[in-house]
């Protein structure tokens, strides 16, 4: 899996620095959504210490290359990062109690049905489509 991400870096003439490779390995190993401080903790625990500035700069590079997804929680002003896999459609549900994301995949047909109800089908090109919902998971 790392090889495909490294290939994108090489194709874009980016150096394969130790911090950049360590960040990719971290995101591969921890395939959930994480904020900047959580990523730093993962790297520190893996004996790959890095500064927050270096992590942030590398995340920006990975985002520009469309290797990661970014979600900003407007209520907390918190940014979350997740490694991007194959293009596919999702609803992301952020559980307020557990402070974590759950992913619900959608088919193109389901997305088109959602868009048709809002008369947006002619305006949207489906490459990736994300719906982010916030709430609480009730297991009753």
From Swiss-Prot:
Pfam families: FUR
GO molecular function per UniProt: DNA-binding transcription factor activity; transcription cis-regulatory region binding; zinc ion binding
Superkingdom: Bacteria
SUPFAM superfamilies: Winged helix' DNA-binding domain
Any one GO biological process: regulation of secondary metabolite biosynthetic process
Alphabetical list of InterPro entries matching this protein: FUR, WH-like_DNA-bd_sf, WH_DNA-bd_sf
PANTHER family cross-referenced by the UniProt entry: PEROXIDE-RESPONSIVE REPRESSOR PERR (PTHR33202:SF8), ZINC UPTAKE REGULATION PROTEIN (PTHR33202)
Protein name as it appears in the record: Uncharacterized protein MG236
């Amino acid at each position: 899996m790392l090889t495909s991400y490294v290939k994108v870096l090489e194709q874009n003439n980016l150096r394969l620095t130790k911090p950049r490779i360590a960040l990719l390995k971290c995101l591969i190993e921890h395939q959930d959504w994480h904020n900047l401080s959580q990523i730093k903790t993962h790297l520190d625990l893996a004996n790959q210490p890095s500064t927050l500035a270096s992590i942030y700069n590398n995340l920006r590079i990975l985002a520009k290359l469309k290797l990661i997804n970014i979600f900003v929680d407007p209520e907390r002003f918190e940014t979350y990062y997740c490694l991007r896999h194959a293009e596919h459609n999702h609803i992301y549900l952020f559980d307020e109690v557990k402070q974590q994301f759950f992913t619900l995949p959608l088919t193109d047909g389901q997305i088109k049905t959602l868009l048709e109800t809002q008369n947006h089908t002619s305006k949207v090109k489906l490459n990736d489509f994300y719906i982010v919902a916030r709430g609480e998971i009730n297991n009753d």
